[in-house]
Amino acid sequence: MNQKFLDAQKEMFGLSNKIKKLQPVTKKIIKILAVVFGVLITIFAIFRFSPYKDLDSFLKRQNSTRFYDNENKLIYVLPLEQGLYREYYTLNEIPQELQKIFLIAEDKNFYFHPGFNIASIFRATKQNIQQNKIVSGASTITMQLARIITPRQSKTKITIFTKAKELLNAIRIETRLSKNKILELYLNSLPFGNQIEGIGSAARNFYNKNLNELTLSQMIMLSVIPRRPSFYSPLNNPQNSYDRAMEIGSQINFHIKKNEWISSTKITETKFLQTRMHFINWICKEYQNKNQIIPNKVNLKIDLPLTQLIEKELQQQLEIFSDSRIQNGAALVIENKTGNIISWVGNSNFENPNSGHVDGVISKHQSGSSTKPFLYALALQKGINPTTIFADIPKDFGGANVYVPLNFDNRYNGPQRMRVALASSLNIPAVELLYNLGIDSYMEFLLDCGFYSLQGTREKTGLSLALGSNEITLLELVRAFSIFPNDGVLKEIQINQQTKKSNKQVIKTDTARIICDFLSDKAAQSLGFGNAKVFNTEYPSIFKTGTANQYQDIIALAATKEYTVGVWLGNLNGETVIKKTGSSIPALIARNILDYLTLPKLEQLDKKESLKFSQPEQYTKTQICTLSGCKPNQNCPSVSLEYVKNQHLKEFVNSECSWHIIKNGRLSINYPSEYQHWVSGQNMTGFSTNQIYTPIDFSYPTDGATFVFDKSIPKHVQVIRIQAYGGKINQAELFYDGKSQGLATNRFVWQIPLEEGFHSLEIFCANETKKIDYLVQ
C-alpha cells in the first residue's frame, strides 16, 4: 500500500515537472495568438472604419422611381438623368431562382469567401502567366460590386495593381455589409447597356415583365448580358448569347434549341402612357420643393380604369367641338375622406403639339362662376341668413370706377332667394354680396381655402372677383370645393398611401352642409339652367359650373359625399374659342365620372343611405314666403322651405311677410322701392311701389360713370341697359353718340353695346331733354 502511494507520488511529481517545462511554450503560443488576433482586429478595423466615400455616395444614390396604382399595378417608371433606368428591388423581391442563376454564372462560392477567392486567384494568375496576358479573371461578386462603386477610368490599363485595389475595396465592403446586402446591391447595379442598370430595369426594358414573371430562359439571358452587354446582346449577337447561356444552363440541367431560345427571349418594348407624366411631374416637384428624396417605390391611389375613362371622355368631347377651337382638357378626382388623388389627367393628349405638355390641372385659369359657392359660404359664416332675398335687378357698384355686372343671359329676375341666386348662378346678387362683404375679407377667405394663386393679386382685384375673374388652378379649385361634402374641412392632398398630413376646418360644419343643400337643389337650379338633365343624378350630388375669358376657360365641379371632381376645357395656347360653348360639356364629363364611382354602390342599401349629404344641426327648415323670404302670411301664394338658424326662430316668427296684401279685394304685391324700374319693365299687374314722377332723367347709368369690361363674359354679349324715368308723356327717344337708338314707350329701356372710349347719351321726351357722358375702359 505504501509502495503504491510512493509510486503515485513519483508519477505526479514527474507530470508536474513536464508541465513546468511546457509553460514557457504555452505562454509563447498565447502571446503569438494574441498578436495575430490583435493584428487581425486592427486590419478589420482599418477595413471597416476607414473612410470609404465612394461606398457612402453609392448607398445614397438615386434610383428610378416606380409608381403603382391603387391595385398595385405599375403605371410608370421615372428615369434618372439622361434617360438612365435603374430600378431598385430588395432581395426578398428578387426570385430565389434568379439569384441562384446569377451566383452560378458569376460566383458559386459567394457566401463562403471574404470578398475574394484564393483558388480562383491562383488559377487566374497561372493562366495569365502562361499566356503572358490577362485571359482570365478572378473577380468575385463583391469585387465586381467594388468596380461598380469605384469605376475604372476608361483608358486605364488593367494591371495587378488595379485588381489588388478592387480586392482591397471588396474586403472593405465585406466588413461593412452583409452578404445578402452585397448581393442585393450587385443585382440592382449590373450594367445591361442601352441606359439600363439592374435586373429589375433589364427585365422591364427587355421583356416588359416584372421579375416574378420572367421565364427560366429569360432569367438565364439576363445573367449573360452584364459580362459584355454588346458582345452578348440577344439582338446583335444571338449566337454569342446562346452559347454563353447554354454554359450556365448546363449547370442547372437546362437545355434548349437555338431557335426556341431566340423565340423565348424575344425582346418586347415597354411603353408607358405619356398622359401619366403630368401627375408624375407634379409629384416630383412636390418632393423637390420639400427637399425630400423621392422613394424607389410610390404607391398611389390612382384608379387606372377611371383615368382611362376620363381620357376617352375628354378626347371625344374635344373632337365633337373641334370646330370651336377647344383643344385642351384636364380633369382631377380626389377622395374626400382622405384627400387622395384617384385620377389626374393634366391634358387630353400629352403628345398634342398644341400645348399637350402643359398640365391643365396646375396651370392657371379664370374660374368664372365656379367659385361662387365660396362667396356664399363666407356670407353664411358672417351671419347672413339663408332666408335673405337678393335683388337680381340692374345695378352698378363702386365709386370712381363703376362696375356693372350682367347676368349671362342678360335677363333680370327680381327678388331671389339665396339658394336660387347660388344654384342658378346669378351674377348681380353675387357682386352685391361681395360689395357688402368686402373684397379684402373675401380674398382672405379664399386664401384660407387654399387658393394660393391669388397671393399678391389684391391690388388688381375688383368686384369681378365675385364672378371668378382672377386666375387659379384646377387643383386648388377641386381641393377647396371638397370642403362642402367634407363638412367644412380642407384636406391636404395626399401623394401616396404613406404620407400623413394635417387638415384644417375652414368653415363651420353647418355652413358646408347648407351650401351642399343649395347646390343639390334641382328646383333652385331651374331658373338658370332649366331642367338640366346632366345635374339629375340617381344619387345625392352637387354641381357648380363656370365659363370665363371668352369661353377660353370652361369649368365644371361636381361632388358626392365621397368624391370631388373637377373638369376644365379650353385652350392652353391662348387661342380664342370661336363659337359659344356651354359649361354643360365639362359637366357631362364630371357627371360620367361620378356615375362610374357611385352607381355600383347604389345596389347596397346601407351604402345608398350613407351617400346622402348630412343636414345642418343648428338650423331648422321652416316655411317662408318664396318672394319675400319672411314668414308667410295668409295671402302669400307660394311658400318654400328654407333653413332658419335655431336661435333666430322666434325673431323669424314675428317677421311676417308684408309684400303680399289684399288691395281693392285683389291680391297685390307691394315691392320695395328698389324694384320700381324692374317691375315697370315686367308688364306686371297687381303690384305697387312708391313711384314718383319727375322730369325726364336717367336712372341708369349715372353721369360720369366709368365702366370696366368683365373678362368673365364674352364681349359680344356685354351691353349697357339704359333706363330712364319721368317725363310728361309715355314716349321717349334715345341718342347714343348722336345716333338714334329708337323710341321707347311706357318703359324707357334700351340696350347699347359696351364699347371702349368716351360716349354720350341724350334722351328726348316731348320738349324735355337730358344728356350724360360715360367712359368704358
Language model feature labels by segment:
Residues 2-70:
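N-terminal type II signal-anchor transmembrane helix
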Residues 12, 25-26, 68, 250, ...:
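Soluble, non-transmembrane domains of envelope/secretory-pathway proteins that act on or interact
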Residues 37-44, 133-308, 312, 444-447, ...:
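Non-catalytic, structured segments within soluble enzyme domains
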Residues 130-154, 271-289, 337, 384-442, ...:
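Conserved catalytic neighborhood of penicillin-recognizing serine enzymes
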Residues 174, 226-244, 294-306, 352-392, ...:
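Active-site loop and adjoining helix of the penicillin-binding protein/serine DD-peptidase-beta-lactamase fold
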